[in-house]
Amino acid sequence: VIGRALLLGAALLQMNVMNAPPKPKSYIVLASDQITVPANKKATAELRFQVVDGFHVNSHTPKSELLIPTNLKLNVADGIKAGTPEYPKGTEYAFSFEPGEKLDVYTGSFTVKVPVEVSAGEHTLEGTLKYQACDHAACYPPKTLAVKLVVFGK
């Protein structure tokens, strides 16, 4: 009887694991893919990111040194100068098991603004967004999202 109960329990556990929703490959997507700015003048490139429903990512300034901040790193490219990214203010969030500890996170859509100056024509601003995603129960290992934004200087 005990052996059958253990087998039934193992089968139910396996069914729950198999029926659990799969974790996304990426918890964030870059929602903007191209912009147009005045050529040879200071402008702002807005990179809009979308966090997958049910998840949040630590802001650029999380409230704990144990958490990994969201960080945009851009590569140098011909015809385009990019300044220091300006991150939005995060939203306070608390896990249900630790309601007294407030975290600073991004959920839904958030925009990082980057000062740019581009010459006339088409240019590509590339880099990476490093982030740590969490859901209501746990935080996951950090990930890196490749970022590519086409910038037209007119």
Give short role names for the model-derived ranges:
Residues V1-I2, V17:
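Short hydrophobic transmembrane-like helices used for membrane targeting/insertion
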Residues N16-K154:
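Extracellular/lumen-exposed scaffold segments
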Residues I2-L8:
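Sec-dependent signal peptide recognition
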